[in-house]
């Protein structure tokens, strides 16, 4: 399950704005917002690119975390 808050936290820690993150992923900002808000799915290549940008070790926490109530 995608964890939007974890991705946002990783971006803040890395000092990356959403606008720059979208550019680094090769998409416009509105597409990034749709993906972050669950309107569209992340592709495998986008997840791979996020790993290159933020670090491969961040991927499990962002994309495969279990929600705890």
Placement of each model-derived feature along the sequence:
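Short alpha-helical DNA-recognition segment
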Residues: 15-33
């Amino acid at each position: 399950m995608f964890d939007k808050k974890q991705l946002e936290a990783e971006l803040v820690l890395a000092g990356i704005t959403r606008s720059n993150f979208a550019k680094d992923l090769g998409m416009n900002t509105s597409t990034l917002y749709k993906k972050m808000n669950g309107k569209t799915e992340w592709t495998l290549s986008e997840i791979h690119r996020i790993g290159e940008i933020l670090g491969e070790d961040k991927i499990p926490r962002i994309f495969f975390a279990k929600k705890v109530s």
